[in-house]
Structure formats: C-alpha cells, structure tokens
C-alpha cells in the first residue's frame, strides 16, 4: 500500500496508521536552536546512517487524534496534555525539547492543511509527532544528541471496531515491560522490548496482548493501560515511573469521577486482579488512543484461562467508552477544556 499519499476514497479496511496524508510538518534543531517549522510533502528525510537515534535510541513520540464534528468543525483532543508528555519524554532522553507553542502550531497547521482528509465519525485523523536525534556520530553513546528533528505525521483512521466489540485474550507475564526509570517515557525502545513477549504469547496462547506484572504487581500491557471495573467502581495502578501515564486513561478516570464512579488508584496485585475478575460483574479493560477502551474477556496465567466476568465486554466498559467517544466527537459538552479547535 502506498503510505505517502491519501485521498478521501482510501480503503476503510486499511490497517491502523498505514495511510498517511500528503503533507507533514517538520522542524530541525541545529546550532543550539530550533529552526522555523514548515509543511512539506510527506516523504523520505535526509537522515545520516550514523544518526544518534538509529544507534542509541534517542527518539520519542506521541499519538492523538483530531475529530470532525457533525457541524463540520474539527477539534484536536487533549493537545496540551500530549505535548506536555512529549516534553517529559524529551527531557528523559536528553533530547532538545522544542517550545510547546511550536509543537502546537505544527500540529494545528498540519490539520488545517489536511482538513479534507479528516474522516467523519466514527473515523478520525491520527496525529503522530516524533522527535529524534540526528547528529551523525557513532561514538556518541555517552553524549546527548546535539542535533534533532521533529516531524508530525497525520493518518486518517476509521472505526477500530468496525466488526463489533470483541473481548481480548491477555497473557500474564511476571516481568517488567521495560527499565523502571523509562516506563513513563513514550519511546520506541519500550515498544520493541514488549514485542518479543507479545508475539510469543500470540503464537503459543492466541493472546492479543501481554499484561506485565513484575513481582506479582499489575503494571501495564505492551501498548495500553489496564483497568479493573465492577459496577461503579474502578481500580487501576497508581502512577509511577515504571509505566506510561496514558492520556486516555486520565480522560476516562476524570470522566468516571465526574459521573459518580468510585475510582481507586493504588498498587494492584495479580491475586487481587484474579479475584476481581472472578466476580460475575467483574470487568477488565485496556485503555489507549487507538481503541479508547477495550474489554478483556480472558486472562491467561500459570497454564490456566481465567474468564473475566461472563467473558464478554462488560456493560460499564461499554458505557465508559461511549461516554469518552461522545466527548471526543463533540456530541457531549467539553466539561474539562480538552478540545482545541482548528481554525
């Protein structure tokens, strides 16, 4: 599939993120300062094979969406929060962090350029800023990248669950997903570290994801946060440096509290999780940008399959997902100032 061009007739069954718009936003960091950003045709970049990011992993990224409302207006969801997390990741990796205002300008100018490519609901325009070190030096393992590039890509995406909501099968692994001090950094190395266990679990157990539980404490999956739900109660791990602070997670918990849910954030053990899901009304779910909230039907641990509740996507999971999607699409009031309009 041609991933460098897109039009409104692009196939809706295309894999998530595989179709890109014709334009991208780009800015370079050189001589100690960020240069002016600009819009360019999406395509190859002049990156040296000795670039710092290719050898020493100095790269981080974000992922969020712009939505077309029923009235035709376009809004970016939680732009400020995602830029804040990008800055946090850049600092953790000793990358030169651009001014947040410049990042916002790049995102909004790109969405404005690509207005025609923003699908109507239930689709959206997925936005991917990526920041990486470009200085060509294969001997710079102990040195921060003195040159860098920031690119913002845009990808029209459609309904993640076009075939209907299906419960996930999750394999439990008693190990950490990544180095504890890097868990909250959105960097490619963390996803690569989770890929081997995830592929093995898929091959051996038909699992969709791996839930990492180092020392018997529930952490996260390879690409999503983990929540337990029962009635109007939600239990999830409290934030620390060992796992990614999901913006979708934050949005869901904020909405849930506003709607009267009892939300608890603390250390959650695997034993507690297994007891929770054994209840008839027990639910478990994964939260993330792509799917918003996905129900878990089975946890696989120690050679056993543990059914979550009745094994289907639970009613509270569906209700919370629908509530957040309604806010994202502008169908419900923006109580928390999460929407940034595209002029």
Q: Which residues make up each language-model segment?
A:
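Short secondary-structure junctions
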Residues: 115-123
